[in-house]
């Protein structure tokens, strides 16, 4: 009887362990949030955000049930040009004073095979929320001896005009001075919570 109870307890603890949630916190030093947008139709301008945070919580090994939360401080925008950064913080674009954060809340993370995922979630900029799909590449996990790390690369393209980033002077030759489509690239390294 005692062996049966111990076996049952061992099985139960194994089952609980399999379904236990694992939390991953952002390693901000080894992560970045970048964007690129066309400029004057003929070139691109790149930039990044310096202040951001996020986490991922999942109980399945394939991360298909992952819950992802990410936020960016829009006033931390950096294009290596102070004047342009000031313009991006203005009401023509982010209006950082009134809308200091942009957020992403993941709704589903669908495994596609070969460490590829389709991450779908709600992106909110200037209090406008739209569903966005990110193409995600999972870099895997490694035990560093001080903890477990995981890496991800996520890419999406959004129409900035749909979010109220309204600066859109037309060029005489056609097109916009600043393109409407913005490529977002998020490179993250995450630490498994202990």
Question: Which residues make up each language-model segment?
Answer:
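Bacterial Sec-dependent N-terminal signal peptides
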Residues: 1-23
């Amino acid at each position: 009887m005692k062996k049966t109870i111990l076996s049952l307890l061992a099985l139960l603890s194994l089952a609980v362990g399999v379904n236990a949630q694992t939390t991953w916190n952002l390693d901000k030093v080894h992560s970045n949030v970048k964007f690129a947008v066309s400029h004057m139709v003929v070139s691109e301008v790149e930039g990044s955000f310096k202040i951001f945070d996020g986490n991922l919580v999942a109980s399945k090994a394939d991360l298909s049930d992952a819950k992802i939360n990410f936020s960016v401080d829009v006033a931390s925008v950096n294009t290596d040009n102070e004047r342009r950064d000031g313009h991006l913080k203005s009401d023509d674009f982010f209006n950082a004073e009134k809308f200091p954060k942009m957020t992403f809340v993941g709704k589903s993370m669908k495994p596609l095979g070969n460490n590829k995922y389709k991450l779908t979630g709600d992106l909110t900029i200037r209090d406008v929320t739209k569903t966005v799909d990110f193409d995600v590449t999972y870099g895997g996990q490694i035990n560093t001896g001080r903890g477990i790390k995981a890496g991800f690369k996520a890419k999406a393209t959004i129409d900035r005009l749909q979010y109220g980033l309204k600066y859109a002077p037309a060029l005489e030759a056609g097109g916009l001075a600043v393109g409407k489509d913005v490529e977002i690239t998020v490179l993250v390294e995450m630490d498994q919570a202990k």
